[in-house]
């Protein structure tokens, strides 16, 4: 049995739809899967047990990447062809069953939206597949003892909580007698985000574990999964953290938590008092701008939410 699954180019979107892929695999244990996605998201699928291959999409002019993908898939007969990108590709392939994300429902979470494509109910939670090699690499990086993971970057500055706030939070959560007393602090981010994380890393000093663009995504994901708590901006790594099962606290302002809050029993979020629309309405928003829209979120608010989340997770694990 052959299944084609076209996933997102983006880490976060690919992660949020991973539960649909995992549920397909659970329902069809004999199937072999071809996953098509962008280079950034491809490592998320490397350790999927039933994956036969990954086709990495390279965006081309005039959407020619879709024609290139069609050329690489048209010779196969697919038992199931699923397109989470919403293109028309599946209609030009030989398949027993075709499904595509035709439109977004902006009133529900992206996990629920993804589940609609194949009618899965309840919506399957995102799944993080980790290889033994990635786990070993993460163990070597983090070692033993408690770890606080911080996702202090994002794809634009408006979604980034100020680094001085992350530093104050880390100091409060790891102080003597605190919920993560003495924990080391791992800071995560992607390639090209080093400048955004530099002030935080400098403030943490010797206790910092710098994982901002220093390791591949699979290793970063495995390292996040080893942490005791993840606190981060709305980003792909936040969704990776939630899928791993680590207690995950997301920080929201100019993105909608109805669609993008971290998904799972061990997840929570804090957002600005102002809505996404209100934040955009009161500023002269320019893509790529250099100002944070999360400055109104107090350190004390995030600290309290983090402590409550961690206590709840520990209570449920006991």
Please place each PLM-identified region on the residue numbering.
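Catalytic machinery of carbohydrate-active enzymes
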Residues: 1-318
């Amino acid at each position: 049995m052959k299944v084609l699954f076209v996933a997102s180019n983006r880490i976060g979107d690919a992660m949020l739809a991973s539960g649909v892929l995992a549920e397909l695999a659970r329902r069809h244990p004999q199937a072999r899967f071809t996953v098509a996605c962008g280079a950034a998201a491809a490592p998320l699928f490397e350790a999927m047990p039933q994956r036969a291959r990954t086709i990495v999409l390279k965006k081309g002019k005039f959407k020619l990447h879709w024609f290139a993908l069609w050329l690489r898939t048209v010779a196969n007969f697919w038992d199931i062809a699923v397109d989470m990108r919403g293109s028309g590709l599946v209609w030009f392939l030989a398949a027993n069953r075709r499904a595509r994300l035709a439109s977004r429902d902006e009133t529900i979470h992206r996990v629920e939206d993804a589940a609609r494509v194949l009618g899965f109910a309840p919506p399957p939670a995102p799944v993080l597949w980790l290889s033994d090699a990635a786990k070993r690499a993460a163990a070597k990086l983090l070692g033993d003892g408690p770890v606080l993971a911080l996702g202090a970057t994002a794809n634009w500055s408006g979604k980034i909580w100020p680094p001085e706030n992350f530093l104050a939070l880390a100091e409060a959560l790891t102080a003597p007698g605190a919920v993560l007393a003495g924990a080391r602090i791992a800071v995560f981010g992607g390639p090209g985000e080093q400048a955004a994380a530099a002030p935080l890393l400098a403030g943490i000093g010797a206790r910092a574990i710098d994982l901002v663009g220093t390791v591949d995504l699979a290793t970063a994901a495995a390292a996040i999964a080893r942490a005791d708590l993840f606190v981060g901006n709305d980003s792909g790594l936040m969704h990776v953290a939630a899928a791993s099962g680590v207690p995950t606290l997301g920080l929201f302002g100019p993105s909608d938590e109805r669609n993008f809050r971290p998904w799972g029993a061990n997840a929570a979020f804090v957002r600005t008092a102002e809505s996404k629309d209100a934040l955009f309405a009161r500023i002269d928003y320019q893509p790529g701008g250099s100002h944070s829209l999360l400055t109104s979120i107090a350190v004390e608010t995030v600290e309290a939410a983090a402590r409550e989340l961690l206590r709840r997770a520990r209570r449920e694990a006991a």
